UniProtKB/Swiss-Prot annotation:
The gene is pth. This is Peptidyl-tRNA hydrolase. TRNA binds at residues 18, 69, 71, 117. It is found in: Cytoplasm. Coiled coil: none annotated. It comes from Aliivibrio salmonicida (strain LFI1238) (Vibrio salmonicida (strain LFI1238)). It catalyses: an N-acyl-L-alpha-aminoacyl-tRNA + H2O = an N-acyl-L-amino acid + a tRNA + H(+).
Length: 196
């Protein structure tokens, strides 16, 4: 059974200084999809972000990269969801994931925020529902929680970045499977992928 996902969000911090930092990995998924479909992402003040729209597998899919800071992402997501009457379970949020290594990505439905401020605010602004889909892009972990802030706001070394980029590419391919054939088939493919 297919999933009626109507909104894909890529979490990020705004500004050039953050563009290639690990915390912006979610936005790279949306940027890659927009590039593949050759559509521009436009600033939309009422949605506090960059928006676009693509057609994939006969479905309309709205794209959003919030231009709020990460910890205010929910404001942008809630605004566009309310305007287009998109339910939480029709939203897929792509985000960086400390608990997965670079080169790995996983789909998930529901769950907590795992300390991710973008997810925390999204859950809060969607009336505390956790039932949206997530696309977790592995960035690895610095080894100690005290180093996390500097790590996520830093740029990955070239080899790690290549692994993350490969996982982003595979994620965009598996998104088509998610939309067409459902979560378990998309998970079966994406969860066996590991960039080397």
């Amino acid at each position: 059974m297919s999933n009626q996902i109507k909104l894909l969000v890529g979490l990020a911090n705004p500004g050039l200084e953050y563009k290639r930092t690990r915390h912006n990995a979610g936005a790279w998924v949306v940027e890659e999809l927009a590039r593949i479909h050759n559509i521009p992402m436009r600033e939309e003040a009422k949605f506090f972000g960059l928006t676009g729209r693509i057609q994939t597998n006969g479905q309309d899919l709205r794209l959003l990269i919030p231009t709020t800071f990460m910890n205010l992402s929910g404001k942008a997501i809630a605004s566009i969801a309310k305007f287009y009457q998109i339910k939480p379970e029709e939203i897929l949020v792509a985000h960086d994931e400390l608990d997965l290594p670079p080169g790995v990505a996983k789909f998930k439905k529901g769950g907590g925020h795992g300390g991710h401020n973008g997810l925390r605010d999204t859950i809060s602004k969607l009336a505390n529902t956790k039932e949206f889909y997530r696309l977790r892009i592995g960035i690895g972990h610095p080894g100690h929680k005290d180093k996390v802030a500097g790590f996520v706001l830093g740029k990955a070394p070239t080899k790690e970045q290549e692994l993350i980029d490969a996982a982003v590419d595979e994620s965009t391919r598996c998104l088509d499977i998610l939309l067409k054939d459902g979560l378990s088939k998309a998970q079966n493919r994406l969860h066996t992928f590991k960039a080397e």
